[in-house]
Swiss-Prot record:
GO terms for molecular function: rRNA binding; structural constituent of ribosome. The keyword Ribosomal protein applies. Part of the 50S ribosomal subunit. Coiled coil: none annotated. It comes from the Bacteria. GO terms for biological process: translation. Belongs to the universal ribosomal protein uL22 family. This protein binds specifically to 23S rRNA; its binding is stimulated by other ribosomal proteins, e.g. L4, L17, and L20. It is important during the early stages of 50S assembly. It makes multiple contacts with different domains of the 23S rRNA in the assembled 50S subunit and ribosome. This is Large ribosomal subunit protein uL22. One of its GO terms (cellular component) is cytosolic large ribosomal subunit. Pfam families: Ribosomal_L22. Keywords: Ribonucleoprotein, Ribosomal protein, RNA-binding, rRNA-binding.
Length: 110
């Protein structure tokens, strides 16, 4: 039994989001929620919201017991990048890349 939740186009760099995803991969959902609650990274709040959605999906759609769930898979894929311009001296300009992510969490029975 698996339940999936996704957050597409999350406004955070995939590199930064993967740091948080690596912390909870393979952990029980209780332990993962605790880790995310006390992490002071922006990505932790986004990943926590997706994890809570996956838990709710497992409970509602599959009738799973929350105590038996763990984070089977979590991965962060790169979303589209917004290109922005930052003016510089002497008529030059630099390109700013505002990256986005697709966060996917899969919870399953142990």
């Amino acid at each position: 039994m698996e339940a999936i939740a996704k957050h597409n186009f999350a406004r955070i760099s995939p590199q930064k989001a993967r740091l948080v995803a690596d912390l909870i991969r393979g952990k029980s959902v209780d332990q993962a929620l605790e880790i995310l609650t006390f992490s002071n990274k922006k990505a932790a709040a986004l990943v926590k919201k997706v994890l809570e959605s996956a838990i709710a999906n497992a409970e509602h759609n599959e009738g799973a017991d929350i105590d038996d769930l763990n984070v089977a898979k979590i991965f962060v894929d790169e979303g589209p990048t917004m290109k922005r311009i930052m003016p510089r001296a002497k008529g030059r300009a630099d390109r700013i890349l505002k990256r986005s992510s697709h966060i996917t969490v899969v919870v399953a029975d142990r």
